């Protein structure tokens, strides 16, 4: 039976260029969508620009244009970049749309009627010059822990500590430079804590389509930490409102109050799909009504799991809609082992890649060849990129057609021999279900390894049968025709297998093969006595100069990525040189982790219950991003500063020491290992 599927990628924010980090997700999604369509399923792929919020408003003001004009321009740029990489959206829309406004307000009203919205008076920092309340990231100051300057209002990028904006020393507005004031304001909260029972059931449940989990195992473990165990929950209610001035949608019956961008952003999935449905005549309600039998999948980055696996399903369910079938998260992209960061400009833009004339299918293949169903970071190693593309796509795949097509054209009038009984083709066809399952399960790396293994088998067949020698031998025309026909059929099968990853090459190959289009059926079927067209070269090799030119075009961002500690070093120089006596004041001890857990209300902190041998202590550490499953640290030995002055960690409690960790090249913090035999309380030094 034909499946009905809605698929989305996370919405790019309308405040900058698309970089290759974005492309990881959109390539991952596009490959899956193209596979579904090749299989004959009704699959709709929708996305949009995420256009609301203070950053967009301020960026437009800085440019001296209306926010509406700025986001329209950015959307055109984003769509051009994605289209250049053959991302085949059925609709690429904007969250600043009439559909999104209507859906956002309807969902809010439904949640309010369901008792899930509550108003509260809160205190916030206010910019007296700009007459606006300041989001955390628009307050800067001195870190209260390490005293690094110019740190954001929610966490320190030097030492990793999280805090509230009011804890900053000498805070100032990043908008005007003014000293902010603490003022009261009425805000609206989505009572997420009351949704815990539903969320515990949904996050740990399986979808009715095929019985697979709604979430990946790593994501489920993280949700369990946030949701708590048993009847208790650690979920905090969610502030869904912002004060004017703000670029977004005004909350019904609340003048001067606007929906926080993270409320209307996921609703943008609905809006984009509704816009598509109205254009092509699809029943929108069939996909979003409660109890819908259709499928809905969201492909996202691991950094926005909290919103998509908790807020979004709860918003949908308690407003009378269906919840997602699956939420699939991926890791981040690094370049030559270094972290990419949009906020710091350390990224290779999609536009620069295209402008340098590099084939986008090279990057599609390379990224797909590293993706699997787990939440793992992937690295773009530029030398490996060159060698893998040249070896796999040019050396193994397209050369098959190049080596056989000339003989078919010159010796057999462009017509193939019927080779339905070929053992080689039977071998390729036998892998159809396995490779289909790998695509379905997002195990692209495994699928492409298997496809390249088949390509190796075809090339071994070429070398064993040597069509160039058969062409020179008397009485071998029949055998030459047979061998070359097998090779063209094998090339067709490989093209069908690769079509989700290489859509443009597949389309060009279809023209050469004289086929209307490549479908998944081509992985099993032979072409018979089929006439083909003259072969045109399908793919060039990657040249070192092309990659060198790409690096040159992005040299400032690449240089920043290659020296991530440069900015931090200025803070290190502030400290005076330590003497031996100074060092001896630091009492470092071995401690055993009795229990480690996530901290409610913080995406940075982990809470450690530690046994120092002589006593037990609680220490908070800002390493949550490095350990998605904190429970795996239970029983581990760590090194901690035992005489570090206790420090109050905002609303989370008192930290009674400091755990030592190492900052890796990709920006993560990793706990230091303790050699076997060390016991809790042992002194380090």
Curated annotation (Swiss-Prot):
Its cofactor is Zn(2+). One of its GO terms (molecular function) is methionine-tRNA ligase activity. Its main location: cytoplasm. It is found in: Cytoplasm. A motif ('HIGH' region) lies at residues 12-22. SUPFAM superfamilies: Anticodon-binding domain of a subclass of class I aminoacyl-tRNA synthetases, Methionyl-tRNA synthetase (MetRS), Zn-domain, Nucleic acid-binding proteins, Nucleotidylyl transferase. Binds 1 zinc ion per subunit. It is an enzyme of class 6 (ligase). One of its GO terms (biological process) is methionyl-tRNA aminoacylation. Its EC number is 6.1.1.10. Residues 582-685 form the tRNA-binding domain. GO terms for cellular component: cytosol. PROSITE patterns: AA_TRNA_LIGASE_I, TRBD. A motif ('KMSKS' region) lies at residues 339-343. Zn(2+) binds at residues 143, 146, 156, 159. The keyword Metal-binding applies. ATP binds at residue 342. It catalyses: tRNA(Met) + L-methionine + ATP = L-methionyl-tRNA(Met) + AMP + diphosphate. Disulfide bonds: none annotated. Coiled coil: none annotated. Keywords: Aminoacyl-tRNA synthetase, ATP-binding, Cytoplasm, Ligase, Metal-binding, Nucleotide-binding, Protein biosynthesis, RNA-binding, tRNA-binding, Zinc. Homodimer. Is required not only for elongation of protein synthesis but also for the initiation of all mRNA translation through initiator tRNA(fMet) aminoacylation. Belongs to the class-I aminoacyl-tRNA synthetase family. MetG type 1 subfamily. This is Methionine--tRNA ligase. The gene is metG.
